[in-house]
């Protein structure tokens, strides 16, 4: 399991908090907290997906748009880190 990346984690937390603020919600967003439990709706998840793509300048592959990857900041961070790593030749 790869170690967490503080910069990536903080940027994702900032995105989540921004969406919560737009909805006039405040929550303690921890890396392990389930995003639905802190108040994100399915539409918020779409906005979060778009925000992640814009923030990290990549398109999330269809195969990575799964409930498992959007469960928490931690799972999102793992997916982002995987996408940001340069492709290795087989």
UniProtKB/Swiss-Prot annotation:
UniProtKB keywords: Phosphopantetheine, Phosphoprotein
O-(pantetheine 4'-phosphoryl)serine modification, residue list: 42
Keyword Translocase among UniProt keywords: no
SUPFAM superfamilies tied to this protein: ACP-like
Post-translational modification remark: 4'-phosphopantetheine is transferred from CoA to a specific serine of the apo-form of this carrier protein.
Residues annotated as domain Carrier: 6-84
Listed GO biological process terms: lipid A biosynthetic process
Any one GO cellular component localisation term in the record: cytosol
Record function comment: Aminoacyl carrier protein. Can be charged with L-glycine via the formation of a thioester bond between the amino acid and the 4'-phosphopantetheinyl prosthetic group, catalyzed by the bll0957 ligase.
Protein name: Aminoacyl carrier protein 1
Organism: Bradyrhizobium diazoefficiens (strain JCM 10833 / BCRC 13528 / IAM 13628 / NBRC 14792 / USDA 110)
């Amino acid at each position: 399991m790869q170690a967490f990346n503080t910069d990536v984690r903080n940027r994702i937390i900032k995105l989540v908090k921004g969406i919560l603020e737009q909805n006039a919600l405040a929550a303690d967003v921890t890396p392990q907290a389930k995003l639905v439990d802190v108040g994100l709706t399915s539409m918020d998840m779409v906005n979060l997906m778009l925000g992640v793509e814009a923030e990290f300048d990549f398109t999330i592959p269809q195969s990575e748009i799964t409930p498992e990857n959007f469960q928490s900041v931690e799972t999102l961070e793992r997916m982002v880190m995987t996408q940001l790593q340069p492709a290795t030749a087989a």
